[in-house]
Amino acid sequence: MERTYVMVKPDGVQRNLIGNIVSRFEQKGYTLAAAKLVTLSKETAETHYSEHRERPFFGELVSFITSGPVFAMVWEGEGVIKAARQLIGATNPSEAAPGTIRGDLAVNVGMNVVHGSDSPESAEREIAIFFKEEELNDYQKDSNKWV
């Protein structure tokens, strides 16, 4: 089963948006395999966002993502990586479609509420940064036959 990493960023946690975001994934029939509230260390943040290391906004990004707790999640289901990206919406909220998480909830590109893996490779790498294998739950929901 395909898995993806989704993280509610500090602005989303502070604005009490965790439940709203979780509900959107549940309503699409995806299964929550793992979740935890954690405040990232600078080292973990730099590892997570390593592909942006040479970008001018890297320092601000690391500072923001370590400014408070994040809600780290692993979702699973068929096509969940692509579906999560569609649910999340464009990085810049002003370009995100209404009905997407960022289109409905994000304030600006710097505080865009949520992160989601953009590929199977990213999902695997990001899940491994935040979760040990034994923290990932593998179960079948009875409701799966209905969605």
UniProtKB/Swiss-Prot annotation:
ATP binds at residues 9, 57, 85, 91, 102, 112. The modification Phosphothreonine is found at residue 91. Its EC number is 2.7.4.6. One of its GO terms (cellular component) is cytoplasm. One of its GO terms (biological process) is UTP biosynthetic process. HAMAP family: NDP_kinase (MF_00451). This is Nucleoside diphosphate kinase. The lineage of its organism: Bacteria, Bacillati, Bacillota, Bacilli, Bacillales. The gene is ndk.
